[in-house]
Amino acid sequence: MSLEVGKKALDFLVKNSGARHNLEVDFFGGEPLMNFDVVKELVTYGRSLEEKYDKKFRFTLTTNGVLLNDDILEYANKEMSNLVLSIDGRKEIHDLMRPFRGGQGSYDVVADKFKKAADSRNQMNYYVRGTFTHNNLDFSEDVKHLARSMYLSISFARLLR
């Protein structure tokens, strides 16, 4: 998403929010960290709209974690009310569902980053989002794995085909 489109979306939200004071914006899809400079500019723009229109934005960032680093995490902890970490369960399932271009799995790249992210938020205001598909009909095993290995808050999303 371009900065211009993002600003228009925030303007539309404010214009159509009526008397509602609290507004929610979730950066997700297409991996927002690939366009993180625009995300930051939109948060700054949203903060300026708060003052101008007496609104309060709650921003959420959803990420697959591949590009997550200390600088992004520090920013997210300051500006994002919630952080959603998208992982598809235990290593063999996640690697099957989310390989890199060369076929290598991504679990080992993101698992430690997600643990660090959860710890940096004091185990609060973050969520783990897994995906239930035909490849993991035993998704309860993935939930147990995530709960045991690093996470407290787990949400479910159904992928329809």
Task: Please identify what each model-predicted range represents.
Residues G29-G30:
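Short acidic donor-binding/metal-coordinating loop in glycosyltransferase active sites
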